[in-house]
Amino acid sequence: MSSYAPREIPLDIRLMQGTSRALFWLVALGCLFVAGHWLMQRNWWDIRAVRLQGDLQRISPVTVRAEALPQLRGNFLTINLAQAQRVFESLPWVRTAVVQRLWPMQLAVTLQAQQPVAIWREPGSAAQLVNTQGQAFTANLGEVQGLGLPQLSGPAGTSAQVLQMSQKLQPLMQEFHQTVATLAQGSGGNWSVQTRSGLSIDLGSAPDSAATQTRLKQFMTLMPQLEARYGRSIDSVDLRYPNGFAVHLQGVDLPGMNKTSNKTPQPAGRKD
């Protein structure tokens, strides 16, 4: 019985077979790609509803339909969820948004609303609001009328710092039945506050220092006695003095009050 060794396929034929197989798979993949692209572009995949959930107290569905939905690009399969998230987060009163696909052909959008705690002003810019994180955001100020929000102001980008200072001062003010109405940090670093009763207080450059806090408490304690003594309300007080404070009464100017010296006190950090 004879046996035959398998014939070796010539190199040119092997190359032709390999090329044919490669071309076949390329054509097959191309057809699949074209078919997939065609399927994804059909209106079968159009987004048919957007479900809003979360904190919607200040977020109007009308605003969402008018401003957000026209900016969404793609269908259920092709929409870029990160880009859609940015669209929703650009809406007034929206702090964060989470966008997810929801079968069949829907988007679920979970919104977290901004929580305003103050009105913010900085040089050269329109008034904004400040949220609980100290971030300034733009919204219709008319929507917060009646909330009694304090007004804060300072250099650009300092909203968080000014809000933090306001929160430090408020408990001390409340001890003396006062409430912060405005707090401002000037370009030179000095701070001033006005209470809802109309009292203006110049706090100097370190309002949270122990020395300033002590002088503020001393003044608040003496304020009723001073007003009773002079028969007038106090308009303003300057706490930038190392050993006391200076007050201004309605219609009366006082030279300065210093408990340790008869001479007119100088603002802290200043020499005669």
Swiss-Prot record:
Residues 45-114 form the POTRA domain. PROSITE patterns: POTRA. GO terms for cellular component: cell division site; plasma membrane. It is found in: Cell inner membrane. Its main location: membrane. GO terms for biological process: cell septum assembly; FtsZ-dependent cytokinesis. Gene3D superfamilies: Cell division protein FtsQ/DivIB, membrane protein fhac. Keywords: Cell cycle, Cell division, Cell inner membrane, Cell membrane, Membrane, Transmembrane, Transmembrane helix. Residues 41-272 are periplasmic. It is a single-pass type II membrane protein. It comes from the Bacteria. The chain crosses the membrane at residues 21-40. Residues 1-20 are cytoplasmic. Pfam families: FtsQ_DivIB_C, POTRA_1. Belongs to the FtsQ/DivIB family. FtsQ subfamily. Part of a complex composed of FtsB, FtsL and FtsQ. Essential cell division protein. May link together the upstream cell division proteins, which are predominantly cytoplasmic, with the downstream cell division proteins, which are predominantly periplasmic. May control correct divisome assembly. This is Cell division protein FtsQ.
